[in-house]
């Protein structure tokens, strides 16, 4: 898997940084002192003489252990688990996940040892873990297209920049990313190479509460949409807009946002009352899941999906909107660090589980908190 090879290349770079030498890669198990592989995909791992039961049938789990022959075994339950296990070795030799972004140059070493009894087993407690590049207007966007990855296309955040972001996420064992979506930034899928580099680093791409079905509505409707972004009076064109993107990305790792708001962080068009909005959202959810069934997986319950009741949508949810059981409910703060709705016992028992959409900083009218860290760490 590509993400495993990505992690191995990072490890090799890290080893060279710490020990001033490189790892020699060999397919011959007798010569290699480090064995890397994924359960069920590598005979070397399956026959390494290490108990793999603690990570079997788990998502993104890894195990580091010293075998009876003195070899270090790095095993993963799946491709991301294996990659995280490789990156754990980088941490053990002293390389910070922030080594590039924070200029955290690792200390030089001549030797590194693990005891014969060494065993390190880890797995995530949260299935989808990631960040949202937002309010990027005077930060990431100008730095990317003007400085780090110069481009003639104003506002373009390209694959070179995303590679640095995704490397950090991989090193931190994060697996999910919502791309920048303000009007100052070129939409993620408009730039060649962006979706490919996400796959290279094992990243699920998703979209925010006002960007359903992998569409940057704010940046893409004006180019690809027809008429008003209104599911009451223009549903055929809106559905076609979503369908184009689902067809394009169907084979990739995605976390599909369901539902609908306005073009950019406003209430939906065409429905004024709570009951009208509930009726529209009920149809939207059905039609969106029909697209996922048609293009992604005939068993739509196996497709990663999330519904985000942000701002006015929470009122619609409280009015009785029914969200399919396997769809994750992502609860939101009030923009200032206080969660508006904590899941009930019934919501906690849902197959899709629950998530959190949280503002570390907030930009919005009539005031914003971009320059001062006003969300106390105890809230986070």
Q: What role is predicted for each listed range?
A:
Residues 96-154, 160-180, 352-355:
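An acidic-aromatic substrate-binding cleft motif
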Residues 129-133, 176-179, 205-208, 256-258, ...:
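Hydrophobic faces of well-ordered beta-strands that scaffold small-molecule active sites
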Residues 170, 175-178, 185-188, 193, ...:
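Structured mid-domain segments that build the active-site/substrate or prosthetic-cofactor binding neighborhood
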Residues 73-76, 134-159, 175-185, 220-238, ...:
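The substrate-binding groove and active-site-proximal loops of carbohydrate-active enzymes
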Residues 1-123:
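Contiguous, structured surface segment used for ligand recognition
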Residues 68-105, 188-215, 219-247:
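Hydrophobic or amphipathic alpha-helical targeting/insertion segments
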Residues 23-25, 107-114, 182, 189-190, ...:
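Gly/Pro-rich turn-and-neighbor structural signature
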Residues 15, 78, 131, 173, ...:
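Conserved, mostly hydrophobic/aromatic
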């Amino acid at each position: 898997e590509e993400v495993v090879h990505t992690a191995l290349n990072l490890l090799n770079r890290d080893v060279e940084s710490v020990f001033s030498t490189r790892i020699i890669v060999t397919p011959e198990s007798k010569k290699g002192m480090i064995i890397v592989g994924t359960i069920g995909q590598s005979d070397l791992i399956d026959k390494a003489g290490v108990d793999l039961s603690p990570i079997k049938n788990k998502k993104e789990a890894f195990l580091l252990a010293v075998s009876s022959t003195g070899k270090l075994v790095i095993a993963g339950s799946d491709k991301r688990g294996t990659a995280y296990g490789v990156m754990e070795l980088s941490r053990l030799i002293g390389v910070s996940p922030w080594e590039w972004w924070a200029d955290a140059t690792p200390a030089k070493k001549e030797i590194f040892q693990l005891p014969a009894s060494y065993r390190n087993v880890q797995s995530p407690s949260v299935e989808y873990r990631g960040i949202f590049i937002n309010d990027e207007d005077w930060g990431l966007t100008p730095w990317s297209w003007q400085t780090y990855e110069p481009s003639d296309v104003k506002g373009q955040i390209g694959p070179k920049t995303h590679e640095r972001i995704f490397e950090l996420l991989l090193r931190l064992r994060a697996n999910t990313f919502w791309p920048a979506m303000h009007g100052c930034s070129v939409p993620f899928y408009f730039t060649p190479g962006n979706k490919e580099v996400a796959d290279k680093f094992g990243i699920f791409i998703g979209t925010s509460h006002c960007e359903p079905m992998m569409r940057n509505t704010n940046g893409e409707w004006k180019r690809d949409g027809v008429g008003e972004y209104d599911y009451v009076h223009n549903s055929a064109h809106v559905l076609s807009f979503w369908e184009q993107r689902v067809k394009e990305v169907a084979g990739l790792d995605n976390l599909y946002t369901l539902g609908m708001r306005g073009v950019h962080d406003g209430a939906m068009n065409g429905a004024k009352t709570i009951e009208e909005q509930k009726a529209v959202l009920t149809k939207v959810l059905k039609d969106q899941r029909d697209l996922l069934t048609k293009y992604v997986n005939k068993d739509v319950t196996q497709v990663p999906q999330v519904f985000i009741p942000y701002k006015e949508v929470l009122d619609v949810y409280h009015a009785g909107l029914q969200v399919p059981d396997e769809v994750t409910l992502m609860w939101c703060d009030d923009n200032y660090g206080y969660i508006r709705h904590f899941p009930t016992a019934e919501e906690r028992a849902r197959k899709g589980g629950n998530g959190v959409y949280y503002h570390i900083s907030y930009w919005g009218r009539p005031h914003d908190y971009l320059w001062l860290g006003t969300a106390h760490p105890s809230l986070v």
